[in-house]
Each structure stands twice: as structure tokens, then as C-alpha cells.
Design a protein with these regions (language model features):
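FIC/Doc superfamily catalytic core
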Residues: 1-13, 17-29, 34-296
């Protein structure tokens, strides 16, 4: 069978190369094959019928993220989300990589610096966080489970210096007691039971609200099930659940960090601190959606 390139197919069908890639990523071109980052399209393939504008406008954010991820489309909301969520979430936990370095790693899978010393863990965890986001996009519609939560932690911490420590469990619950912000957390022997109870309570609700997702996040952070990486895993979970329930997700940026921490501390006494902080962050993400013309 003779195959054509994306450019040749675009010329044949009189559409853009981007449209051809999107059709292939959506599985609408019979026989199309992806080799590395290059699509090969059968010469006999028929141009898919165009989706009408109404259906296009009804595509959810999750649909767009999945399509752009599959087609490796650069410069869209998937690209933006990967860089912004990874940079800000890692930066909150002490990563010294700049926004530009984070972007460069995502776009080129390399890091170029002169006269600067970088922490290897910062680079590894940045690359790993990109993979975590891919996982939550792929599994956004699945029920939240211990298996998925542990998988996120495994991906995040694989290959780091923590992974070489005997007392550090990569992809599993903590072995040693820890605290967060001077506050006691669940003891290692209590974690499994508390996580099962938290998930059972959360999953018993057929539909989740913005408040339900925040409440789960606070409970998760107070259990602090892992030795390290709880904050990033917790924020990834929130992003996933927002996608699942068609709630506009959000990214806690550096200038919201202290308000976010205060909100975690005060939840249960004054929920407004965390709610308001996350709503501000949500408004910022809505601005991204407006720019990329994605309905919400």
C-alpha cells in the first residue's frame, strides 16, 4: 500500500496540515499510522466529513486536551497546561527551574544552560510531571482510586534521589511519620485505612461539585499519604477531577501560594479562604480557554 505524508494529504484534500493531523489523532482516517511523531496516510484514504460548527463548539476541554495530546499539537491549551501546571506546582515545592527552562524541557526534551548549576531532581521531576499530566488526561473519566493515585506518585518520583533511599517508597504509602506545616498527619499504619475511607466517601457521590473536589484535596493533604510529593499529586488529582466533571480546572500560581496554604489550614473553619483562592485561579484558566476559543 502506498502512503502519503501529512503535507501531501493536506494538498490532496485541500485542507490544512493541522486538520489532517487532528483527523488522524481522532481515528477518523482509516489505515493512518503514527511512526514516532510522523503520520503516514494511505493514498486511498477518504477525507473525513467535516464536523459541523455546532458540534465543534460543544467539544469539552477534555476532548481538546486529548486531541492535542494525541496529535502532539504545539501551541495550544495542552501545551499551555503542561508548562503552567508543571512549573507552578513544582515551584511551590522548591524547584529552582525557571518558567523558561520548564518550557524548554517540554518542547525539546533537553536542557541548555551556561554558567549555572541545576539540581538533577528538579529536571527529572519536571519531565516526570509532564508524564503525570498525560496520565490524568488519558484517565480523566476513570474513577479515582488508590491504584491511580499511587501510579501518579510512582511516575513523579521515579529516577529521583528519593527513589534510591531505602526508607522512601516510590508509588506506595509512606514508611515513616511526617508532618506538614507543623501539623501532624496520619501515621504510616493509618494511611491505607484512611485513604480507603476517604475514597469510599468521595466516590459514593454520583456527581462532584467544585467544593467536593476541594474538600477531597484538603483531606488528602491532611492524611499526607506519601513520604514526599503529596502536594503535587494532590493538585494533579484536583485537575483530573475537574476535567471529569466538566468543571474548569485551575493552577495555583506563585502569587496565590500563601493564600492556598492558608486555605488548606483553615478549611473546616472558614472554607472561603480556599474557595476564593481557587476561584481566582480558575478565572485565570478561563482566560486561557477564552484565548483558545474553548467553550466552558
Amino acid at each position: 500500500m502506498k502512503y502519503l505524508s501529512v503535507a501531501e494529504t493536506a494538498a490532496k484534500w485541500q485542507i490544512s496540515e493541522r486538520s489532517v493531523r487532528n483527523y488522524c489523532a481522532q481515528g477518523r482516517v482509516q489505515g493512518a499510522e503514527l511512526h514516532g511523531r510522523v503520520w503516514s496516510i494511505p493514498k486511498t484514504a477518504v477525507k473525513p466529513e467535516r464536523v459541523n460548527k455546532i458540534k465543534q463548539s460543544e467539544r469539552s476541554l477534555l476532548n481538546v486536551l486529548q486531541e492535542e495530546k494525541a496529535s502532539r499539537y504545539a501551541g495550544g491549551i495542552y501545551h499551555k497546561t503542561q508548562i503552567e501546571l508543571t512549573y507552578n506546582s513544582n515551584h511551590m515545592e522548591g524547584s529552582r527551574l525557571t518558567h523558561e527552562q520548564t518550557r524548554y524541557i517540554f518542547e525539546t526534551n533537553t536542557i541548555g544552560v551556561e554558567n549555572e548549576v541545576l539540581n538533577v531532581d528538579d529536571v527529572i521531576e519536571t519531565a516526570n510531571h509532564f508524564r503525570c499530566i498525560d496520565l490524568l488526561i488519558d484517565k480523566a473519566k476513570t474513577a479515582l482510586s488508590e491504584k491511580l493515585i499511587k501510579e501518579l506518585h510512582f511516575i513523579l518520583k521515579t529516577g529521583t534521589s528519593d527513589a534510591r533511599k531505602d526508607w522512601f517508597a516510590v508509588g506506595d504509602y509512606k514508611k515513616l511519620p511526617n508532618e506538614v506545616g507543623g501539623r501532624d498527619t496520619a501515621l504510616p499504619e493509618e494511611v491505607s485505612e484512611q485513604m480507603r475511607a476517604l475514597l469510599a466517601k468521595y466516590n459514593a457521590k454520583k456527581s462532584k461539585t467544585f467544593k467536593d473536589i476541594l474538600d477531597f484535596h484538603v483531606c488528602f493533604e491532611r492524611i499526607h499519604p506519601f513520604q514526599d510529593g503529596n502536594g503535587r499529586v494532590g493538585r494533579l488529582i484536583m485537575f483530573k477531577e475537574c476535567l471529569k466533571y466538566n468543571i474548569v480546572p485551575f493552577i495555583i500560581e506563585d502569587n496565590l501560594k500563601m493564600f492556598y496554604y492558608r486555605g488548606l489550614k483553615e478549611w473546616g473553619k472558614e472554607n472561603g479562604f480556599l474557595m476564593d483562592t481557587c476561584l481566582v485561579a480558575q478565572d485565570r484558566y478561563k482566560a486561557y480557554l477564552d484565548y483558545f476559543r474553548i467553550a466552558y
